[in-house]
Regions:
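Extended recognition/assembly regions associated with phosphoester-bond processing machinery
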Residues: 1-185
Length: 185
C-alpha cells in the first residue's frame, strides 16, 4: 500500500506550489512566498510538471531544467502532510489540462489531496455521511507563463495562476488549507 511507504512531513505549516520545466520563476512571487514562509514559520515545497513546447512529451529527459532558485524546494513524491491530507507531488499533469483534477477523485484513497498544477482548482469529493469532508486542491505556479501559441496553450496561459496553497494544523490536530494568489501589486 502506498500509505505504508509514504513519507510523513514534519511541521505545522507548509506552502505548496508548482513549477514548469525550462521556465524561469516569477521572482517577485517567489520572494513573497519565501518571506511568507519566514514570517509564518512555514516550509516551502514545490512540485514540478513537464511541458514540451515542441509538441511532444519527453518529461524528465536530458535538456529539461528547473530554475535554480527553486531546486532546494522541489518535492516530487507523495507525502502525508497531516492526518488525511496528502501532497501528491509525484503527479505530473500537463498544464494544458482543462480539468487537472479529472480522474483523481479516488486517487487519495479517502484523504484530501494537494496537486501541483498551474491552474487553481478546488473540488469537494463525495464521502460517507459521518466521515470528514474530502477536498482536492491544485496549487497554482511559481514559474512564468510559457506555452505554445495554439488553442490548448492559449487556454492554459489564460488559466495560469501565480499561486500557492497553505496547509496548517492546529494544536487539536485539525488542519486547514487556503490558497494564496499573487496580485499585480
Amino acid at each position: 500500500s502506498p500509505a505504508k511507504t509514504r513519507k510523513k512531513l514534519r511541521g505545522k505549516r507548509f506552502v505548496f506550489t508548482s513549477a514548469q520545466n525550462n521556465t524561469h520563476v516569477h521572482s517577485d512571487f517567489l520572494s513573497s512566498l519565501e518571506n511568507y514562509c519566514e514570517v509564518n514559520e512555514a516550509e516551502l515545497l514545490v512540485g514540478t510538471f513537464h511541458y514540451n513546447k515542441k509538441g511532444f512529451q519527453r518529461g524528465g529527459e536530458d535538456g529539461d531544467w528547473f530554475d535554480p532558485k527553486i531546486r532546494k524546494y522541489i518535492l516530487d513524491e507523495s507525502c502525508e502532510v497531516f492526518k488525511d491530507l496528502l501532497w501528491c507531488g509525484e503527479l505530473n499533469i500537463l498544464p494544458t489540462a482543462a480539468n487537472p483534477l479529472s480522474g483523481f477523485h479516488s486517487y487519495t484513497q479517502g484523504a484530501s489531496g494537494i496537486v501541483p498544477h498551474a491552474k487553481v482548482q478546488l473540488e469537494s469529493l463525495p464521502s460517507p455521511k459521518h466521515d470528514p469532508c474530502r477536498m482536492l486542491y491544485t496549487t497554482g505556479a511559481v514559474t512564468q507563463r510559457n506555452y505554445v501559441k495554439m488553442k490548448a496553450g492559449l487556454k492554459a496561459n489564460f488559466h495560469h495562476v501565480f499561486g500557492a496553497v497553505v496547509a496548517e494544523v492546529d494544536e487539536d490536530g485539525d488542519w486547514f488549507v487556503r490558497q494564496l494568489i499573487c496580485n499585480s501589486d
